[in-house]
């Protein structure tokens, strides 16, 4: 699908459909839509009255033109109430438009953005671009019969007084971010019989070759030499060996250094504390954090910001066997902290313990980890919101602010000393589970805190809720969402002063 900017008059342009955006507050047709209504002898305004149409978010009014103008259809799509408008609504509405176009078997469409309420067209064209690409996504490679219809071109109509060259740069940024998120979705959606630890490391190697990243991949023997006892314990129950992956993007004019760590469980059965069938379903998505690392690297490989980025993944599988680790086992992490195992299904934090210790030894300016870590976070915040924790409030605030800009919902969960008491172990430095069933998302974050150098600002993002969805929402289809690829990439762009080059 091509996305192009244009400044056309729309009352006599040849296309399959012209989509006009409208706020619910609008009481009359204006501009190009008013001209088209006259050309259709009031066909649009008559249908609005007949259907009692209100431009609620995502609600369509489709008008066949019956050859009276060159466009086959004219459509209105609602933006909802103006006072509730935010840029993410444009992403959502763009995704609805692309799905409607596919439903109607349209090949080329125009989206008109000439609304006086729109002030920042950088944000308008980027949000629409992202929404189109994210909404167009489907994971259909394993279907024997597929819907082959594709929309070939979307033209986004902008006001003539806008700087088209500048806006094309934001279309490009939107394309890169959305394609990186879709790449992440593809990886998460692949089952464990297709992507295991070895194959995941091979994907990292392909990324490194394509974009010129530095890469180190450590095998089981090397992982043991590095003293990663917590990670190895989780991995040893599976016939698929662990692979520790370290990607590095290192530009010439680096403005700082950030390490990104992703939880990389190719599949999580729960181990000896085995999950029930309902809870084991979709556990291919327990690699979502690691896949997000790869998605972020794909984006920065294209955008080339002036900031050094480390991508770190401890890839493993948590399986029951005679070799599997057990409750009551005591493990030693890379940084020397000892861990008493309370439950083998709290394995992600064990792999992250060694990954965060490794990241801390790199002495970056900041560390971000992303993990489908706890069901407790889903209970606390629901399926659509990620939980954010960390050791530096300024850093947490920066991530939360960025998530508001990208439409990837996040909310802070507070650390406190009373919950720290709940991860004290009887016979080791720390328990891998809390001693009560309360505050589980936070106690997991507090566990991770013990493996991060306290001098390094660190944020933990629990994406257990929004990383994967059984029915989909907004521009996310059923399955993997690719969250939080756009948030973390956008944060890296801002931190590296990327937008100074284009005057944002």
UniProtKB/Swiss-Prot annotation:
Binding residues for Mn(2+) 2: 263, 268, 286, 347
NCBIfam families: PRK00913.1-2, PRK00913.1-4, PRK00913.2-3, PRK00913.3-3, PRK00913.3-5
Family named by the database record: Belongs to the peptidase M17 family.
A Pfam family reported for this protein in Swiss-Prot or TrEMBL: Peptidase_M17_N
Name the record gives this protein: Probable cytosol aminopeptidase
Coiled coil spans: none
Binding-site list for Mn(2+) 1: 268, 345, 347
GO cellular component, one term: cytoplasm
Superkingdom as given in the UniProt entry: Bacteria
Cellular compartments annotated: Cytoplasm
GO terms of biological process kind: proteolysis
Major site of localization recorded for this protein: cytoplasm
The enzyme's E.C. designation: 3.4.11.1, 3.4.11.10
Swiss-Prot/TrEMBL cofactor(s): Mn(2+)
Co-factor: note: Binds 2 manganese ions per subunit.
Active site per UniProt: 275, 349
Keyword Metal-binding among UniProt keywords: yes
General function of this protein: Presumably involved in the processing and regular turnover of intracellular proteins. Catalyzes the removal of unsubstituted N-terminal amino acids from various peptides.
GO molecular function: manganese ion binding; metalloaminopeptidase activity
Enzymatic reactions: Release of an N-terminal amino acid, Xaa-|-Yaa-, in which Xaa is preferably Leu, but may be other amino acids including Pro although not Arg or Lys, and Yaa may be Pro. Amino acid amides and methyl esters are also readily hydrolyzed, but rates on arylamides are exceedingly low; Release of an N-terminal amino acid, preferentially leucine, but not glutamic or aspartic acids
Protein's organism: Sulfurihydrogenibium sp. (strain YO3AOP1)
């Amino acid at each position: 699908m091509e996305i192009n900017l244009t400044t056309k008059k729309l009352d006599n342009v040849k296309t399959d459909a012209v989509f006009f955006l409208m706020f619910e507050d609008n009481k009359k047709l204006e501009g190009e839509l008013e001209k088209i209504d006259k050309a259709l002898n009031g066909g649009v305004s008559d249908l609005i009255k007949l259907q009692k149409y209100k431009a609620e978010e995502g609600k369509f009014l489709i008008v066949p033109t019956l050859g009276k103008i060159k466009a086959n259809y004219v459509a209105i799509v609602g933006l909802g109430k103006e006072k509730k408008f935010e840029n993410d609504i444009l992403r959502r509405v763009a995704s609805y438009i692309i799905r409607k176009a596919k439903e109607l078997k349209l090949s080329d469409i125009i989206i008109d953005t000439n609304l006086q309420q729109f002030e920042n067209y950088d944000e308008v064209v980027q949000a629409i671009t992202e929404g189109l690409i994210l909404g167009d996504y489907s994971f259909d490679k394993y279907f024997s019969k597929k819907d082959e219809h594709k929309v070939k071109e979307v033209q986004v109509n902008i006001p003539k007084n806008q700087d088209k060259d500048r806006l094309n740069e934001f279309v490009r940024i939107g394309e890169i971010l959305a394609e990186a998120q879709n790449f992440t979705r593809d990886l998460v959606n692949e089952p464990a019989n297709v992507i295991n630890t070895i194959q995941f490391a091979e994907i990292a190697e392909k990324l490194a070759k394509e974009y010129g990243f530095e890469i180190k991949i450590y095998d089981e023997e090397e992982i043991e030499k590095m003293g990663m006892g917590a990670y190895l314990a989780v991995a040893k129950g599976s016939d698929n060996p662990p692979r520790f992956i370290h990607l590095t993007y290192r530009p010439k004019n680096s403005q700082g250094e950030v390490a990104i760590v992703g939880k990389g469980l190719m599949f999580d059965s729960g181990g000896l504390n085995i999950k029930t069938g309902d809870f084991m379903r979709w556990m291919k998505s327990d690699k979502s954090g690691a896949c997000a690392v790869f998605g972020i690297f794909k984006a920065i490989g294209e955008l080339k910001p002036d900031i050094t980025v480390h991508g770190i993944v401890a890839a493993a599988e948590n399986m029951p066997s005679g070799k599997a680790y057990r409750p009551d086992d005591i493990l030693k992490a890379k940084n020397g902290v000892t861990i008493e195992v309370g439950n083998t299904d709290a394995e992600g934090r064990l792999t992250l313990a060694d990954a965060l210790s490794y990241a801390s030894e790199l002495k970056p300016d900041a560390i971000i980890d992303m993990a489908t870590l706890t069901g407790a976070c889903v209970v606390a915040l629901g399926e659509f919101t990620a939980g954010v924790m960390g050791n530096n409030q300024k850093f947490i605030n920066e991530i939360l602010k960025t998530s508001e800009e990208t439409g990837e919902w996040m909310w802070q969960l507070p650390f406190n000393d009373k919950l720290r008491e709940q991860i004290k172990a009887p016979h080791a430095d720390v328990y891998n589970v809390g001693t009560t069933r309360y505050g589980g998302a936070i106690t997991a974050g507090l566990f991770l805190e013990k493996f991060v150098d306290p001098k390094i600002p660190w944020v933990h993002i629990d994406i257990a809720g929004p990383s994967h969805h059984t029915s989909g929402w907004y521009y996310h289809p059923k399955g993997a969402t690719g969250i939080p690829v756009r948030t973390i990439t956008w944060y890296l762009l801002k931190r590296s002063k990327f937008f100074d080059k284009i005057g944002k």
